[in-house]
C-alpha cells in the first residue's frame, strides 16, 4: 500500500491522464503481489454473464428496419456493454440492470454521432475495433457483425496482457468475437487505453493503415484525446465517472457515441 501511495503522490498532478495512472498503479500492484491477472475470475464471470444476454441484445439490434437503424442499435448495445466495469466508486451493475439498459439505451444517449459514423463506415473499407473490457467484448460482436454486413474488413484489437479487466486474446476466444472478425490482434502491451509509444509494430501498422477506428471505453477516451488524431475515431463508452462526464459535457451514467477529431 505504501508503494501505491508513493506512486500516486508522485504522479497525481492536474495534468495527469487517469488511464496512465491506472496503468502504472496496476502494474505496480501486479509486481508487488506476484499476480499478473488479479481480475481473471471477474473477467470469466463477466463473459459468462454477457453471453447469457447476447441473444436478447441481438434481437433488439435486428429489430432495426434499415441498415442504419441496425448499425445504431449495435452501437448502443456495444456502449451498454461498457457498463460492465469494476472498482469505480458509485458504479454498479446487475444482469437485470444490464437488460434494462440494453432496452432503454437510446434514452441515455447524450452524445449521438452514430449518423456521422455510419456515413464514414459506408465509405470505408477497413476498420480497427479497439475493445475494452471482458464481458463488454461479447456485445462488441454485434457491432462487428453489422460492420461486416456493410462489407467492411474488421480487425479487432485486444490488450497484449492483463491490465484491470481489459479483454485479452483469451476473452476474444471466449466471447466469440474471434469468429466474427476478419482478424484479431493485440496492442502488444497492457496499457489502459492507448499509449502509442508502447504498442507493437504490428498494431501500429494496422492503426496507421485502416480507414476508420472504433474505440471502446473510458480508457481509450481518456488517452485518445491526448493525441492529434489524423483519421476518424468513433468513441463508444458510458460516462461512469465525473471527470470523463465533465470533459465531454454530459451527466454521469450516460451513453456517448463521439466522433473525433
Protein language model regions, located:
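Electropositive, gly/pro-rich neighborhoods at or near active sites that engage anionic ligands
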Residues: 1-124
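Short, hydrophobic/aromatic alpha-helical segments in well-folded domains
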Residues: 116-120, 130, 139-143, 202, ...
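Residues at the starts of beta-strands that form the adenosine-phosphate
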Residues: 125-126, 152-156, 232
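Structural motif
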Residues: 126-128, 211-212
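A short secondary-structure junction signal
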Residues: 132, 138-143, 167-169, 225-227
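Histidine-anchored nucleotide/phosphate-binding helix
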Residues: 134-156
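C-terminal functional extensions of proteins
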Residues: 158-160, 164, 168, 173-261
Amino acid at each position: 500500500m505504501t508503494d501505491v501511495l508513493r506512486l500516486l503522490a508522485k504522479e497525481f498532478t492536474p495534468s495527469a491522464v487517469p488511464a496512465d495512472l491506472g496503468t502504472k498503479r496496476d502494474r505496480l500492484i501486479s509486481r508487488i503481489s506476484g499476480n499478473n491477472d488479479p481480475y481473471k475470475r471477474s473477467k470469466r464471470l463477466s463473459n459468462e454473464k454477457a453471453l447469457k444476454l447476447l441473444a436478447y441484445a441481438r434481437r433488439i439490434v435486428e429489430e432495426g428496419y434499415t441498415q442504419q437503424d441496425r448499425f445504431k442499435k449495435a452501437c448502443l448495445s456495444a456502449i451498454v456493454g461498457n457498463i460492465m466495469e469494476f472498482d469505480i466508486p458509485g458504479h454498479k451493475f446487475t444482469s437485470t440492470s444490464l437488460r434494462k439498459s440494453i432496452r432503454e439505451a437510446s434514452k441515455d444517449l447524450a452524445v449521438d454521432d452514430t449518423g456521422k459514423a455510419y456515413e464514414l463506415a459506408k465509405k470505408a473499407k477497413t476498420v480497427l475495433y479497439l475493445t475494452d473490457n471482458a464481458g463488454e467484448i461479447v456485445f462488441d460482436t454485434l457491432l462487428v457483425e453489422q460492420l461486416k454486413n456493410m462489407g467492411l474488413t474488421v480487425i479487432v484489437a485486444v490488450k497484449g496482457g492483463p491490465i484491470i479487466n481489459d479483454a485479452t486474446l483469451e476473452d476474444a476466444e471466449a466471447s466469440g468475437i474471434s469468429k466474427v472478425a476478419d482478424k484479431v490482434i493485440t496492442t502488444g502491451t497492457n496499457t489502459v487505453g492507448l499509449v502509442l509509444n508502447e504498442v507493437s509494430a504490428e498494431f501500429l501498422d494496422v492503426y496507421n493503415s485502416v480507414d476508420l477506428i472504433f474505440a471502446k471505453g473510458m480508457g481509450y477516451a481518456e488517452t485518445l484525446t491526448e493525441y492529434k488524431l489524423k483519421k476518424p475515431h468513433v468513441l463508444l463508452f458510458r460516462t461512469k465517472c465525473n471527470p470523463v462526464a465533465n470533459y465531454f459535457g454530459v451527466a454521469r451514467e450516460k451513453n456517448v457515441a463521439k466522433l473525433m477529431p
